[in-house]
């Protein structure tokens, strides 16, 4: 059980989860607001 905790706490796993969540967030933002290039002009 300790080996599983050690594996889940290493940086590649955490960075994969982080970048996956960030990619999902960016996809949802682009789905709700399709043209992000128009944001600076508001």
From Swiss-Prot:
Record-linked SUPFAM superfamilies: Subunit IX of photosystem I reaction centre, PsaJ
GO biological process, one term: photosynthesis
Recorded superkingdom: Eukaryota
GO CC annotations on file: chloroplast thylakoid membrane; photosystem I
InterPro entries: PSI_PsaJ, PSI_PsaJ_sf
Presence of keyword Transmembrane: yes
Membrane topology reported for the UniProt record: Single-pass membrane protein
Record HAMAP family: PSI_PsaJ
Family the entry assigns: Belongs to the PsaJ family.
Subunit structure: PSI consists of a core antenna complex that captures photons, and an electron transfer chain that converts photonic excitation into a charge separation. The eukaryotic PSI reaction center is composed of at least 11 subunits. Only detected in green leaves and not etioplasts; PSI is only assembled in green leaves.
Biological role: May help in the organization of the PsaE and PsaF subunits.
Annotated PANTHER family: PHOTOSYSTEM I REACTION CENTER SUBUNIT IX, PTHR36082
UniProt-recorded name of the protein: Photosystem I reaction center subunit IX
Organism for this UniProt entry: Hordeum vulgare
Gene label: psaJ
